[in-house]
A protein has these predicted regions:
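Conserved NTP-donor binding/palm subdomain of two-metal-ion nucleotidyltransferases/polymerases, i.e.
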Residues: 1-114, 120-388
Length: 388
């Protein structure tokens, strides 16, 4: 398999990431590292290993580092204020995703993130949303119509990161996954920010895996798997066994196996025997297809039929189309009437803007788009143990 990789189109990018070798023009390497959100981490790795990175890459990485440090200072102020609000309302708010994961990196600025994600119990939304709006947050109108099943983002009053409020962190085939109710027994206080909570590490790892491979179908690139390497670096046999058990319970065992195979490949590591036994490496064709998507970091927005259709029949297709066009009615109830109207007016046009060109190429039979669609279909079918 490695011979195929080294002869492949993505060998120069792997060489940059693993050894700091520059086998392509600086502009191409810089564009790739930016798209993968790896510049701060690449700079840090280069300094540790003594790599001679090109000046353009170094300058760009330093700029991203300073910007990320400033942005995370603003984020920490927001987190403190949200923690105080949670204590005042006596509502548990669970911090997830980037702001949570950054804490396991050697330095938090190595892990860029652009928003703050909170998980909340659905019954607490009527109390939390008015209170957070009173803090000065406003619905981010430009993005209000882009969400199929969860709340639009909220923007802070002045400067800072967007706030994403979730009642579930995923939805697949009509099921809400990774909800507050499913996690409630494992959450624990987030010591740096009183009033906020964080998930059980195993629960959050399974969510991270699902988010990268199932929800985003690998198009987020390298970063989710670098996250996973840092997140699990201190785990023992008990945590690995618990993750394997949970992955089987949620029908995510193949997804987890693929995630750890990709993590080992990207980080150039060998997992302990326990991990290798619990999560066997997928077949070569599946692994190669996944690697190509990860390196490319998703150049096309393909429809998520495999993820979002509740049933593989006409009724399932109609439910899928209704969800895409109208949004999730349960989640929408939390929105003010004006925002509901805005969502339904914007939704068709923004769907057309986001997905129209790719869907048109797919319908016309454009070779590259068709090939990407077929690769994604095969990959998702294998992950779900389905026959095409």
């Amino acid at each position: 398999m490695e011979e195929i990789d080294q002869a492949g189109v993505y060998a120069p990018y792997l060489a940059l990431w693993r050894q700091g070798d520059c086998l392509l023009p600086e502009r191409a390497l810089l564009a790739w590292a930016q798209s993968q959100r790896l510049l701060p981490l690449l700079l840090w790795r280069g300094k540790k290993a003594g790599w001679a990175l090109p000046d353009a890459l170094t300058r760009a990485a330093q700029n991203v580092r300073y910007r990320e440090q400033a942005q995370q200072m603003l984020a920490e102020n927001q987190l403190r204020a949200l923690g105080v609000l949670a204590q005042k309302l006596d509502i548990p708010l669970v911090l997830v995703k980037g702001a949570c994961v950054a804490r396991v990196y050697p330095e938090t600025w190595l892990r860029p993130y652009n928003d703050i994600d909170l998980l909340i119990a659905e019954e607490h939304l009527p109390y939390f949303l008015p209170a957070v709006l009173d803090l000065g947050y406003t619905w981010l109108g430009a993005l209000t119509g882009q969400r199929g099943w969860h709340l639009p983002p909220l923007a802070p009053k002045t400067t800072g990161l967007k706030l994403e409020v979730h009642t579930a962190l995923a939805r697949e085939r009509g099921r809400s996954l990774f909800t507050f109710g499913q996690w409630t027994t494992g959450i624990h206080p987030f010591i740096p920010f009183p009033g906020l909570w964080v998930p059980d590490p195993v629960d959050h790892a399974l969510y991270m895996i699902h988010h990268a491979i199932v929800h985003h179908e690998l198009v987020l690139g390298f970063l989710p798997f670098i996250d996973l390497a840092y997140w699990t670096q201190s785990w023992g046999e008990a945590e690995w066994q618990a993750l394997a058990d949970q992955a089987r319970t949620f029908d995510l065992y193949r997804v987890a196996s693929l995630s750890f195979a990709l993590t080992a490949w990207l980080s150039d590591i060998v997992w302990p025997r326990t991990v290798q036994q619990l999560f066997p490496v997928p077949p070569d064709d599946i692994l190669l297809a996944a690697r190509r998507i990860v390196i490319g970091a998703g150049t096309q927005k393909l429809p998520h039929l495999q993820r979002d259709m509740p049933e593989r029949n006409l009724r399932g297709l109609l439910k899928y189309l209704g969800l895409i066009l109208l949004g999730d009615p349960v989640t929408r109830q939390a929105l003010p009437r004006s925002e509901k109207i805005r969502f339904y007016l914007r939704r068709p046009f923004q769907l057309l803007s986001n997905h129209g060109p790719t869907l048109w190429r797919l319908v016309r039979g454009e070779r590259r788009t068709r090939a990407a669609w077929q690769v994604q279909r095969r990959l998702q079918a294998w992950l779900r143990d389905e026959h095409l």
